[in-house]
Amino acid sequence: MTRQQFLRLLTSGSVSAIAGPFAYPQRAAASDRGSHGAPTNDQPLPTNDQRPTTDDQRPAGFPAGVTKAVTAFIQHSRLDDIPDKALVEAKRCLIDGFGVVLAGATVHGSAIVREYVKTFDVATRGASILGPERLSANAGHAALANAASGHAMDYDDTQLSSTPDRVFGLLTHPTVPVLAASLAIGERLGVSGRKFLEAFLTGFEVECKIAEAIKPDHYLRGFHSTGTMGTFGGAASAAKLLALTPTAIPHALGIAASMSSGIRVNFGSMTKPLHAGRAAENGITAAELASRGFTAGDDALDGEWGFFQVLGGGVDLPRIMTTLGRPYSIVDPGVSFKPYPCGSLGHPTMDAMLKLVTDHDVKPDQVAHVAVRAGSNILNPLRYKTAKTELEAKFCLPFMMSSILLRRRAGIREFTDEFVASAPVQAMMANVETVFDKDIEARGFDKMRSVVVVQLKDGRTLTQPSDERYRGGPENPFTRADLHAKFTDCASLVLSADRIKRALDAIESVEKLANIRELVSALTA
């Protein structure tokens, strides 16, 4: 096209002719489109002349009502109607969640967030920030700080997928954003333990079902689902505690949809846990604004411009429309609890190395070379070939292997900047290689599969495949004793032994508390 032709087209108003096949479809006016609906994953967006003019003319693939279904669930959920098994599992998640919040509050990134929160001089400081010092803030900032702490060590629980077609069979870290939002609003209002538990389970279920329903492309595009899905969980739990009306709840969801974010490029930095913090804070902001009459689209999860389509390329309706609370995701398929404070994709490999080292009594000075063979579902997210900081170490297989070889453990006292940067660790990491294995890749992404191969200086080669029934997962779950031990280890960085016992007692009897502030008191240093 010549410059003269371009100018003639521009002055004639035919801009779409210039863009040709690369033009973005223009949004139809409200009167020219249906009020809900997203295309299926395989269906392209309709052109302007194909778009429906009324709901009755909506084409197949543009279903209505996901936002309405979520709204109805939030409005009508009641603790009395929730199965006992869900209540038991909720308490297990709370034990794990509060433990990792307390431990995570001791790391440098969490301290920076608290210093940021301190700069706000607000009249109402009705919510506590857990950690090594007594602090309070408004609900949003308290939730920001607590949730950022809860994800700071990458030690928080993981939602399991109900089907093996989702990448890794894992979806998001569900507890921390919802816990932080529920605690902040609950403490400010002085609600009972039952109301707190009701809100926690409501937000947890909304977050998990949205994570189930969105297409896997959401995560593959680079979104961090803890930040994106957690925003809806925080909004749902806050909406429940604030008793939002059926009119206000969709607006809260719409605001949350526009505030939902988090990208995977920030894995291995302080910003990854900030995603969880912002999810909790933004969820509260969405509910608080909606409670005051602030508006948003009332179909934000639906439609060609709705959350599912824009951020994930579509929605699997059966995973959400008829499954909210049927069963509760916290029960089936459940969650996995982490035995190590790092990316869960490395845990089966770490257990394999631990078994190899203990079975053969391998000493660090015997090791000549280590190879970890795995598929891209493990090697791509655990992207660091070597680590200089504890944040990088959480996504670095060579560090994970080195820690177990050197200390036969990899806990919160190993994931420190000092240990990661130490000469023995750096030297051992130089001997660890990650290898893409096409045979493992061909078996699919539904499991976390790997093989550890250790060559010793005496010429022996030791091999250990990972166990797909990984510790903390559905086939090898944490016991009550395991959870108590993890909580004690985490909380001991902040609380005395007496307070740790008091906190555990309060969590396990949370539904009996007249005021959730009793639990906050038990968790406060």
State each model region's role.
Residues 29-57:
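Intrinsic disorder/low-complexity segments
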Residues 1-7:
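Twin-arginine (Tat) signal peptide motif
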Residues 12, 276, 285-296, 313, ...:
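Short, well-ordered loop/turn and helix-capping segments at boundaries between secondary-structure elements
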Residues 314-358:
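Membrane-embedded hairpin module used as a gating/binding unit in multi-pass transport
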Residues 343-497:
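Intrinsically disordered, low-complexity Ser/Thr/Pro/Gly-rich interaction regions
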Residues 485-517:
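A short, charged
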Residues 9-27, 31, 55-333, 378, ...:
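N-terminal core-entry segment
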Residues 84-85, 108-110, 294-302, 359-370, ...:
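Flexible, glycine/charged-enriched surface loops at secondary-structure junctions
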